[in-house]
């Protein structure tokens, strides 16, 4: 959900997302796989795919980097929780997946959550 939001908001607003069944031989020609084992844009070094996309596309917005840290905590095993929003984000995204009829609907619904998270973090950063 977060990766799709990041791609559409900050890389390619016209991006289309395909969901390939596990074990399928390969992604269609021209498709960039992400968030799957072995993909260039996936989990690396204890960081989530969102983090990999921010790094790969050289996105310098500090709020996006903060969201990457939040998702790292929500999406990967962490010994210590630093980002207080991580567990809430994880719970909300799980609920969206459970109540959505398919992955594309979940992406659309999740975009509102990530828009709201981004806006709240921007507002919070202005106070500092």
Tell me what each language-model feature is.
Residues 56-128:
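A charged, amphipathic interaction segment
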Residues 1-81:
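Polyanion-binding interface signature
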């Amino acid at each position: 959900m977060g990766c799709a939001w990041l791609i559409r908001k900050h890389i390619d607003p016209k991006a289309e997302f395909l969901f390939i069944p596990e074990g399928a031989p390969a992604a269609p020609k021209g498709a960039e796989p992400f968030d799957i084992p072995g993909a260039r844009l996936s989990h690396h070094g204890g960081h989530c795919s969102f983090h990999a996309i921010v790094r790969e596309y050289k996105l310098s917005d500090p709020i996006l980097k903060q969201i990457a840290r939040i998702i790292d905590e929500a999406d990967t095993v962490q010994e210590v929780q630093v980002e207080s929003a991580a567990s809430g984000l994880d719970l909300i995204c799980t609920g969206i997946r459970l109540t959505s009829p398919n992955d594309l609907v979940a992406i659309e619904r999740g975009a509102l959550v990530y828009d709201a998270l981004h806006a709240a973090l921007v507002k919070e950063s202005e106070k500092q």
